């Protein structure tokens, strides 16, 4: 099973909402709101685990990511397979070097109301998600985000914060599966080169363009 093809397209899409403008909320969400409002760009490393309904790890992966608000993201898997997702705010490119294949999607359709929208989306996050304090566990304060749309492919996303720094994201899908991402070396408001969010298909790659044609 290819990592990106299943939970990652959805994760990347919940990941893009946590950096959208947020209406004022009170209580245990303060750290998340501070991170949300104060972070315009970031880079980090991540470790990803996918669990089945019985809690067994069925996939593990690692890599790096960068984002810039609004709507720009670069997500690269190093292990176990090299795969890349790049979004420039208009289009999302998914590159699988092993297959020499590039898929192009309209970013708005691919990312709205998904986990990636939690970090770099364009809209007020409260129009896409219902947010609530989810208490503390594993040394982190958790916030739960439930999508208001019905066709997102996941039930809820949990965001774990260490102070005002995002440390983890946990995606619960509608089939009882769970994907956990833990972040390291997170650098809020890092200088991210513009080319991080641009992509040109390699020569000879099979390009599948799913964007609307004018």
Predicted regions and their residues:
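Gly/Pro-enriched, hydrophobic low-complexity segments
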Residues: 103, 126-130, 136-211
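N-terminal leader/targeting segments and the immediate start of mature chains
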Residues: 19-58, 201-214
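A short, amphipathic edge element
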Residues: 27, 122-131
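Short, solvent-exposed helix-to-loop capping segments enriched in aromatics
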Residues: 36, 111-126
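Bacterial N-terminal signal peptides that target proteins for export
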Residues: 2-15
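An acidic-aromatic
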Residues: 62-113, 179
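Solvent-exposed strand-loop boundary residues in beta-sheet-rich modules
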Residues: 54, 98-100, 175
């Amino acid at each position: 099973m290819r990592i990106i093809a299943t939970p990652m397209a959805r994760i990347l899409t919940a990941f893009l909402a946590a950096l959208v403008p947020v209406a004022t909320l009170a209580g245990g969400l303060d750290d998340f709101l501070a991170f949300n409002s104060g972070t315009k760009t970031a880079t980090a490393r991540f470790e990803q685990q996918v669990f089945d309904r019985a809690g067994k790890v069925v996939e593990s992966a690692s890599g790096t990511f960068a984002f810039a608000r609004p709507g720009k993201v670069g997500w690269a898997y190093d292990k176990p397979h090299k795969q890349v997702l790049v979004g420039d705010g208009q289009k999302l490119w998914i590159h699988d070097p092993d297959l020499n294949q590039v898929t192009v999607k309209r970013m708005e359709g691919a990312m709205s109301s998904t986990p990636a929208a939690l970090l770099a989306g364009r809209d007020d996050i409260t129009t896409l998600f219902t947010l609530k304090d989810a208490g503390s566990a594993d040394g982190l304060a958790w916030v739960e985000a439930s999508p208001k749309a019905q066709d997102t492919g996941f039930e809820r996303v949990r965001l774990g914060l260490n102070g005002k720094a995002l440390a983890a994201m946990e995606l619960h899908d509608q089939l009882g599966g769970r994907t956990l991402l833990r972040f390291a070396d997170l650098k809020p408001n890092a200088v991210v080169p513009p080319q991080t969010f641009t992509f040109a298909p390699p020569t000879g790659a099979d390009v599948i363009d799913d964007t609307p044609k004018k």
